[in-house]
Each structure stands twice: as structure tokens, then as C-alpha cells.
């Protein structure tokens, strides 16, 4: 990360009551690991995880002493669709992002987040990540099933 730049990742998350397999905790763990391993300028928030929305992320950024600076936004989703284009980027207007979008909220909070700082590539656009998925699928296909398909539900 270039000095002074802040990198954010937008995950989907699960709304309260729908936290499958404690998946929401993985976003917090990812942020902690990114900060510990690479840079304290990495932050992860979600569209749907209570207590980990963009405003919560901004509060964490400020608490970490990062009250201003250039912010780069990346979707942390397989495909960069509606959430990346609208909830993160806030549309296509350079100077008038949609209210409530990450770009709008970050600029309102005193950060610099122009349209060009919103990367609209999903995880599936990176061959390295797709190769990890393929490896995991291959290993899963070669292992014992985790459940009995014939068992009554």
C-alpha cells in the first residue's frame, strides 16, 4: 500500500439472524490478519453484517489514526455486480456519488475517494483466486462426503 493510502474491501455479510456458519466473523478475522501481516491501512466491511457497515469501518479507520487520506475500494465478492457498482462506487458520476454509497460516505467523512479509486473487479476476475477455488473443489470431490445424502432430513 502506498504511503497514506487506505485500502477497503466490501464483503457481503449476512444480516442478523442469518449468520450461516459464523461467516460474519471471517470479515473481522480477515481485517485483523491483513493489518497484522501487510499494513494497518487495510479495512474490511460489509453490505449486510450488522456492526460492520461502512460507518463502522470509518469509525475503525478514525480510531486507528487514519482520519483522512486517499481510499481505494475493492469488492470482496465473487462477482462485482450491483453492490460494487451502487453500494460501493455509488454510480458513475464523478462528483455526485449516490447517497449512502461507500464513496459518498468516505468523501463525506473527509477522505478522498474519487470514482477512479473504486475497482470494479470481482474475486472471480483474478485467476489466482479461481485457481485456489478449483484446488479446494478438487480436494472436496476426492474426500468423504460431510453428510449422508440418504439420511432423512
Regions found by a protein language model. Give the residues of each.
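Extended amphipathic ligand-handling, pore-lining, and cofactor/metal-binding catalytic surfaces
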Residues: 1-153
Amino acid at each position: 500500500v502506498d504511503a497514506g493510502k487506505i485500502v477497503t474491501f466490501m464483503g457481503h455479510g449476512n444480516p442478523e439472524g442469518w449468520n450461516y456458519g459464523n461467516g460474519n466473523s471471517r470479515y473481522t478475522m480477515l481485517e485483523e490478519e491483513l493489518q497484522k501481516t501487510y499494513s494497518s491501512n487495510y479495512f474490511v466491511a460489509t453490505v449486510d453484517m450488522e456492526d460492520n457497515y461502512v460507518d463502522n469501518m470509518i469509525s475503525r479507520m478514525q480510531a486507528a489514526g487514519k482520519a483522512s487520506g486517499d481510499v481505494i475500494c475493492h469488492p470482496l465478492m465473487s462477482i462485482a455486480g450491483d453492490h460494487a457498482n451502487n453500494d460501493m462506487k455509488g454510480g458513475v458520476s464523478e462528483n455526485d456519488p449516490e447517497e449512502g454509497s461507500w464513496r459518498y460516505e468516505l468523501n463525506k467523512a473527509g477522505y478522498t475517494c474519487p470514482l477512479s479509486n473504486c475497482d470494479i473487479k470481482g474475486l472471480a476476475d483474478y485467476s489466482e483466486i479461481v485457481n485456489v477455488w478449483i484446488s479446494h473443489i478438487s480436494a472436496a470431490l476426492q474426500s468423504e462426503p460431510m453428510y449422508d445424502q440418504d439420511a432423512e432430513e
